[in-house]
Amino acid sequence: MSTAALLIPAMILDAAFGEPKWLWSRLPHPAVLMGKLVQALDDRLNEGDGRQVKGVIAVAVLVFVGLLLGWILSWFGSLVSVLIAAILIAQRSLIDHVRAVATGLQNDLDAGRSAVAMIVSRDTATMTGPQIARSAIESGAENFSDGVIAPAFWFLVAGLPGLLIYKLINTADSMIGYRTEAYEDFGWAAARLDDVLNILPARLSALLIALVTGRAGDWGEISADARKHRSPNAGWPEAAMARALGVALAGPRSYDGEMRPFAWVNASGSKSASAHSITRCCEVLWKSWGLALVLVVALGLLF
């Protein structure tokens, strides 16, 4: 079977069941195992001199593990491939986490802050309602690219090996891809490879969002806003979502008690995002997922 034919049931299974707690409370989630592998490489290699070279070695190990494991698992048949893809694509989980912020924010600020703290790394203790909403929307848009479209894309392109390599590198980037004293050198290779692997998926995610919301005509503005972002990729789905909802995203935010300047995305949009804005974001993400599924079905029929 083609990878497109396998991806169709995988996307549907993920959307229907997400990450059932009864299962993953008893078994280690593959993402957790990936994190343990990255942590082991960090503990073993991130010390002494030549840390950038050691970081390249760590990334090479991750690529090799993904390639080998994906090749081995592919021999177990289509059902295994579908199940693994369903587990590693995270649309339902993404929506659940983002929607939880809207629910919390509708109750009170503290509940909203607690919910958004689950999905962002910035300081949340003193966030206002609009800041909570913007953070949730930004996270939803970015993770639609990282957690849904990118894994689906690499599964389409290279099957299980492609999917596993992507998830391993993306996990490494989330753990060691920081410009801090500890990871500036060691995490360089993981961060750069993650950037490369997300170039096409990020722009595809933005296009899907723009198409389902009738904002394709704003592509020039979306592109300009995307380039303001510090990440070469995260700005694309965020800029598209900002236009889709008519809100301004990004802007100054606090990390580790320090307020840092970030350019506004869709600066002319409303800066009063709310729980309702988050709910609309979730609706856009489902519509974008639906269009992605239609495209995968079309590929399955063609190939």
UniProtKB/Swiss-Prot annotation:
An annotated GO BP: cobalamin biosynthetic process
Pathway: Cofactor biosynthesis; adenosylcobalamin biosynthesis
GO CC annotations, alphabetized: plasma membrane
Top-level taxon: Bacteria
Keywords recorded for this protein, A-Z: Cell membrane, Cobalamin biosynthesis, Membrane, Transmembrane, Transmembrane helix
Record-annotated membrane-spanning stretches: 56-76, 78-98, 149-169, 283-303
A GO MF term: threonine-phosphate decarboxylase activity
Subcellular location: Cell membrane
Pfam families membership: CobD_Cbib
PANTHER family: COBALAMIN BIOSYNTHESIS PROTEIN CBIB
Function: Converts cobyric acid to cobinamide by the addition of aminopropanol on the F carboxylic group.
Record-linked NCBIfam families: cobal_cbiB (TIGR00380)
Protein name as it appears in the record: Cobalamin biosynthesis protein CobD
